[in-house]
A protein has these predicted regions:
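Terminal RNA-binding accessory module
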Residues: 318-405
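Short flexible coil/turn linkers enriched for glycine and charged/polar residues
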Residues: 124-126, 137-139, 228, 238, ...
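Proteins enriched for Cys/Gly/acidic motifs involved in redox and nucleic-acid/cofactor modification
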Residues: 1-182, 217-220, 232, 254-265, ...
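Glycine-centered loop/turn positions within well-structured domains
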Residues: 101, 139, 151, 181, ...
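Conserved SAM/AdoMet-binding glycine-rich loop
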Residues: 72, 81, 169-285, 296
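Active-site proximal loops enriched in glycine and acidic residues that flank catalytic Cys/His/Asp
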Residues: 177, 208, 236-238, 274-278, ...
């Protein structure tokens, strides 16, 4: 029997969907993440923005039209926020954000198990694995609905994470979660977890982190890893102190820049990426200019920008919203500034040597990512780790030649 699992939203959703797929495979199901004819469909939804919820509903309708008689199981943040929005789609069962472990059990109950044979070839090992270390968030930023849907922080036992790292066949591991900065297993914080991973030769990369967790202890622990990818996705949201206060972000522009400087002290070639919201409630032109200017001051290598989307149930929902035109114009300017910052970051690193883990071959070039997450293209078919030298900007990254010296 065949199951198709669709995923919308964040890396945590991807990890949780992968767990559902693995469990189904272990029970004999053939699984896929592409739209095709199947016996059942699972949709892991997102609710971070109105658009994400709309896409979730749209996907339900698309699956229903494609295969109207197959059972559809919906889970995730959008169904946690409002499960009723999916009932019109003829959905078999609806689960919240913290009920995803029940999806496979429900499928087993409905189908009475599965006695079909497992596929006779090994599952492909991906080059990058995402390991979830915690769930939930206690920050309650004024614009964010996720803490209400995911709940308070719950951290996985450190020993379980260590065992998963040991067992993981992928050469690169990304530590992920809703708010990994809040990781705490009986007093063992993120720095303690990093120290416990210093045995592994795998490349370790961090998911999105918050300002408060950046300190000497964490950075020293990261330097102790055998292969750390110094790419820090340090969430910003705004470069304006007034907007940061309204967002309930608990740091100032100056404090954020101090954290960036501390990172560069320990990792001079670090890549710092970030998120910025365009057009938050009450954002003045001066506030917005502060967000634009910090892109250069912080030396970001990449900026993920998006327009503010008011979410019901958050404190910002009742605040006066800016017009769609203003938000759209500001978003465009942020995206342009972010693109220029990324181009600058790449150009400054041409001629330098990096280690790339090969991921894909398109018939002409093998591609993979540097420690700082520059996508690199090397002519010819290659595998494993490559020592390369960046030569010039190319496609969505840089071309490179093999340099084994």
């Amino acid at each position: 029997m065949k199951a198709v699992v669709f995923t919308l939203g964040c890396k945590v959703n991807e990890v949780e969907s992968a767990a559902i797929m693995a469990e189904l495979e272990s029970r004999g199901w053939e699984v896929s993440d592409e739209l095709s004819y199947a016996d059942i469909y699972v949709l892991n939804t997102c609710a971070v923005t109105k658009e994400a919820e709309r896409k979730s509903r749209q996907l339900v309708a698309r699956v229903r039209k494609f295969n109207p008689n197959a059972p559809l199981y919906v889970c995730g943040c959008a169904s946690q926020k409002d499960g009723g929005q999916f009932k019109k789609g003829g959905v078999r069962a609806i689960f919240g954000a913290r009920e995803k472990q029940q999806v496979v059990s429900a499928i087993a109950n409905d189908f009475g198990g599965c006695d079909c044979q497992k596929l006779g070839f090994p599952k492909q090992v991906k080059t990058r694995a995402f390991i979830k270390i915690e769930d939930g968030c206690n920050n309650f930023c004024s614009y964010c609905v996720i803490p209400y849907l995911r709940g308070r922080v719950t951290s996985r036992p450190l020993r379980d994470i260590v065992e998963e790292v040991k067992a993981c066949p992928a050469p690169e591991i990304v530590l992920t979660g809703i708010n990994i900065s809040a990781y705490d297993d009986g007093g063992q914080r993120l720095a303690g977890l990093i120290s416990a991973l210093q045995f592994t030769d795998k490349r370790i990369r961090l998911g999105s982190i918050e300002c408060n967790v950046i300190d000497e202890k964490l950075l020293i622990a990261l330097k102790g890893l055998k292969d750390f990818a110094p790419q820090f996705h340090l969430s910003l949201q705004s470069g304006s102190d007034a907007v940061l206060r309204a967002m309930n972000r608990h740091y100032t522009r100056a404090e954020y820049l101090e954290k960036c400087a501390l990172i560069y002290t320990h990792f001079p070639d670090a890549a710092i990426t970030t998120d910025i919201i365009a057009g938050f409630c009450g954002e003045s032109e001066k506030d917005f200019e502060d967000s634009l200017s910090i892109i250069g001051e912080a030396g970001f290598s990449r900026v993920h920008a998006f327009a503010f989307s008011p979410r019901e149930g958050t404190r910002a929902f009742s605040l006066p919203d800016l017009s769609k035109t203003v938000k759209s114009q500001r978003l465009h300017r942020l995206l342009e500034a972010g693109k220029a910052a990324e181009e600058k970051y790449i150009k400054e690193r041409l001629g330098r040597r990096y280690c790339v883990i090969c991921e894909e071959y398109d018939g002409e070039y093998t591609s993979g990512y540097t420690e700082g997450y520059i996508k690199v293209y090397v002519r010819g078919e290659h595998s494993g780790k490559l020592k390369v030298r960046l030569t010039e900007p190319f496609r969505d990254g840089a071309s490179a030649i093999i340099d084994g010296q």
